[in-house]
From Swiss-Prot:
<dbReference type="Pfam" id="PF01551">
    <property type="entry name" value="Peptidase_M23"/>
</dbReference>
<feature type="compositionally biased region" description="Low complexity">
    <location>
        <begin position="36"/>
        <end position="50"/>
    </location>
</feature>
<keyword id="KW-0131">Cell cycle</keyword>
<dbReference type="Pfam" id="PF01476">
    <property type="entry name" value="LysM"/>
</dbReference>
<feature type="signal peptide">
    <location>
        <begin position="1"/>
        <end position="25"/>
    </location>
</feature>
<keyword id="KW-1003">Cell membrane</keyword>
<keyword id="KW-0677">Repeat</keyword>
<dbReference type="GO" id="GO:0051301">
    <property type="term" value="P:cell division"/>
</dbReference>
<feature type="lipid moiety-binding region" description="S-diacylglycerol cysteine">
    <location>
        <position position="26"/>
    </location>
</feature>
<protein>
    <recommendedName>
        <fullName>Murein hydrolase activator NlpD</fullName>
    </recommendedName>
</protein>
<feature type="repeat" description="3">
    <location>
        <begin position="237"/>
        <end position="243"/>
    </location>
</feature>
<keyword id="KW-0132">Cell division</keyword>
<feature type="domain" description="LysM">
    <location>
        <begin position="119"/>
        <end position="163"/>
    </location>
</feature>
<feature type="region of interest" description="4 X 7 AA approximate repeats">
    <location>
        <begin position="203"/>
        <end position="250"/>
    </location>
</feature>
<dbReference type="InterPro" id="IPR036779">
    <property type="entry name" value="LysM_dom_sf"/>
</dbReference>
<feature type="repeat" description="2">
    <location>
        <begin position="225"/>
        <end position="231"/>
    </location>
</feature>
<keyword id="KW-0732">Signal</keyword>
Length: 377
């Protein structure tokens, strides 16, 4: 078959067609061509053979290196310094009683009426109405009434009080009873095993009458409670050392007769010696009636004087006072007029360790033996 024959030509065309179809099948591969980016982009390109081709870096270009992670540095913890705690300095020893601060001032060392600031006083930190009344020579209740201060007599720093001039006269000096004294007198102490405990002194309680009468101020000396030491001012203004008899009373409103304040056995007698009992103690039962020993006016009814519990003081005339301590209940109020034999209280054990009445009679501020005035029985 020659090259120019028609049969040869058809065979050649068929062969070329088969080759073309085969080539077309090879180029239609299912794998897409690998993306090729420009060399200028600095990226690598993949070839159909799967080889990774990395283009050479451009001239003058800086090769970037992956930064290495720096090691973490733990912060240094500095020690925390605690601020220095300073202990507050108190000007006066204090103690807590029923949730209130009680200042343990030694009033025996503070001159009464020593304030020289005029007719007004500005309250300072730590002041109490008792203290202000003491240094200004007033009765604390008169001072409270003058300045419209009600119980419990709270004051504010910077508050101005009208103090005026005091007319009451305090009783100075002091007596103290220890456990040894109590043992000699046969008193059963509440806690005999405890050592002697000092009791905060209280200011003298004064009673300014304001009507020309002598002051009825008579702060009672302490004869108890056993097991404690009480430093309450107790001596009176200078008077004759001779104890008066019942018949030597003042000519103003003389006392015709004295009554026993309650029934019962005298368990402690009057002691004239220093530190002795300044009255008599009468045993009884709780709730037992206590009556006024003579006509008079109640000048004090309260419990501000430690060691006496609920205390009533009656002024009978310019010379005589009577006092009734350790009451369970008080049935009279201050400035109330009472008659001899009138029930004024019930017996109790406030301020002491057993149920009793502590009874005192005072002549011009001096403690006298009540048995020399009371009728025999």
């Amino acid at each position: 078959m020659s090259a120019g024959s028609p049969k040869f030509t058809v065979s050649r065309i068929a062969a070329l067609s088969l080759v073309s179809l085969w080539l077309a099948g090879c180029t239609s591969s299912s794998n897409p061509p690998a993306p090729v980016t420009s060399v200028d982009s600095g990226s690598s390109s993949n070839t159909n053979s799967g080889m990774l081709i990395t283009p050479p870096p451009k001239m003058g270009a800086t090769t970037q290196q992956t930064p290495q992670q720096a090691p973490q540095i733990q912060p240094v913890q500095r020690p925390v310094t605690q601020p220095m705690q300073t202990q507050p300095v108190t000007e006066q020893p204090v103690q807590m009683e029923n949730g209130r601060i009680v200042y343990n001032r030694q009033y025996g060392n503070i001159p009464k009426g020593s304030y020289t600031g005029g007719s007004t006083y500005t309250v300072k930190k730590g002041d109490t109405l008792f203290y202000i009344a003491w240094i200004t020579g007033n009765d604390f209740r008169d001072l409270a009434q003058r300045n419209s201060i009600s119980a419990p007599y709270s004051l504010n720093v910077g508050q101005t009080l009208q103090v005026g001039n005091a007319s009451g006269m305090p009783i100075t000096g002091g007596n103290a009873i220890t456990q040894a004294d109590a043992a000699q007198q046969g008193v059963v102490t509440r806690s005999a095993q405890n050592s002697t405990v000092a009791v905060a002194s209280q200011p003298t309680i004064t009673y300014s009458e304001g009507s020309g009468e002598q002051s009825a101020n008579k702060m009672l000396p302490n004869n108890k409670p056993a097991g404690t030491v009480v430093t309450a001012p107790v001596t009176a203004p200078t008077v004759s050392t001779t104890e008066p008899n019942a018949s030597s009373t003042s000519t103003s409103a003389p006392i015709s007769a004295w009554r026993w304040p309650t029934d019962g056995k005298v368990i402690e007698n009057f002691g004239a010696s220093e530190g002795g009992n300044k009255g008599i103690d009468i045993a009884g039962s709780k709730g037992q009636a206590i009556v006024a020993t003579a006509d008079g006016r109640v000048v004090y009814a309260g419990n501000a004087l430690r060691g006496y519990g609920n205390l009533i003081i009656i002024k009978h005339n310019d010379d005589y006072l009577s006092a009734y301590a350790h009451n369970d209940t008080m049935l009279v109020r201050e400035q109330q007029e009472v008659k001899a034999g009138q029930k004024i209280a019930t017996m109790g054990s406030t301020g002491t360790s057993s149920t009793r009445l502590h009874f005192e009679i005072r002549y011009k501020g001096k403690s006298v033996n009540p048995l020399r005035y009371l009728p025999q029985r």
